[in-house]
Amino acid sequence: MQWEIVALNNPTFDTPAILKKLADVLDREKRSKGAARRKSETGFGGGSARKSFGSNSVSTPPMMNTRTIKRMAGHSRRVDEFSSSAQAKASATKRAKIGGASGIRFDFTTPTKSGALAVSSPIAATTSPICTTGAYKERKDMGKIEIDHNSALEACKPQEKPVEIEILSKVDDSRYMYSTIEQRAEELENQMCEMRQLFKQKHGWEEDDFSPVGFLSAEPVLVCGRICCEAPNGKLNAKSLLLEGSRIHSNGARVKMEVESTLPVYSLFPGQIVVAKGRCPSGHTLHVTELYSEIPPESPKVDNQEKQSLSMMCAVGPFSTQEDLEYEPLEDLLGVVNETQPDVLLLMGPFVHDKHPQIASCLPTKLIEDTPVALTFQDVFTFLLTRIAASVENLKTRVVLCPSTEDIMHHHISFPQPAFHVNMDQLELKDRQQMTFISNPGIISINGISIGVTTQDTLLHLAQEDVVKLDKNKPKKMRIARLAEHMVTQRSFYPLFPPSQEAMLDFTKRRAFVMPVQPDLLFMSSKLKHFVNDIADKTLCINPGKLTRGKNGGVFAKIYVVPQNVDDKGLQDEEELKKKHSILPRTKVQVIRI
């Protein structure tokens, strides 16, 4: 049945319509087989009467089973709402098929738009989507400190006045995923030319010092290009490394790179722009002897930064467990906010997760006075924002919200994303500046401290593609820190190309995820384990972890930037001054279980 395969692979099909169609097809098959059986019994065509097959010999079609209905009802996801009803209807269908029933009928009642759900609705039939089974409430190690970075430092007190938040970079609204191959190729070319110019400025090279990629030479030459894989859809390794030149300087030529036997250490990934020095006697293989890949941006200049302090809390969605949409973990987090009253609360999406069982099945509900009420996606999002606004209304805490590509309520599904469009009148805040909506990615400045934020899982995608050779004689750097460092040294919140399918990247908006300045703090969301690491000499990279993990609680982060009193009158060296004013030695980070 070809339509079944189409249905399984098309999440937009309506579930009741699918099951009704399935019932009709099975009914037609039953009638067809019944006619064939009568034909064989009467010996149609002049032959003798044949033995009649018993009803038990008619088997259920291979596609029609409980697992199939579960997949069709949940669009290949585990949706609790349909599990009980699907199993019951699967058993009824099988009995009807074996017993020779005259027909199959399914009864699916559409839930009401508002008010209490009908008793006959799939949600009312089971309590699992709207009642907590206790997995979150029975969690252990509440308040346990998982990471204590710079534990010797004391937590600083919140400031007496609300802090000022300045947005340093943002993403404008535009038509996303509306581009041609020529436009994407042009952006790739522009990126390579810009990075080439930055390499020249940093190392003092001239244009005459460079040669085209693939230039035949027995002497060492300098070439600039992008790392790519020899196989179009293959995984990068030391044997499949290619260097692709720009169209304007190398006519887009590619040359194989030999690094395994010539370089003691390297860390490469597809899309990385590098300058390589080596010999290319055949014109087909470049024997690399030197590799330049780091070109971090400058830090923003701020006066009197040593006098500034900052207390923050940061949490990454989902903010509700998969059992319900009650947002209990968020309520617990807001309780901690009321106790500690930090200067800033940074919340990173998803806020209404598109993979939540109730959201994926388009049946969001909430308990209101012990009664399940059907909600729209907008209802859930508005309730969430209203609850956050109400919890900080009487505090000096500023709230910063960054969206995610997994947010069902965001109007922009590709990366990079502009900020949420929110009607502030609905939140009824006395001070509208108390909530700030930033883009994904975004860079903000608070008390002279620059903060980069992204919910794109760049770390996971880099971890799946990088090729590395480490120096055994040097201290081993954490892999996570090395991957995060690529973002800063390549000046991009997403330096990988071609991107992962999960990234939903719109490369024509490349300039929107370029890192214009090197942030002091870099917050990123990743499925990888939470961590805190110094990267690129100036940046503290923080993955706070998820606030929830399935049905269980997760972690959040507390950040304290302690003011530094340094007598720098005797310091004449600029680099020494930068080290003294760095926030790395005066930042305390705690990752705590909710």
Task: Identify the role of each PLM range.
Residues M1-I594:
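Extended recognition/assembly regions associated with phosphoester-bond processing machinery
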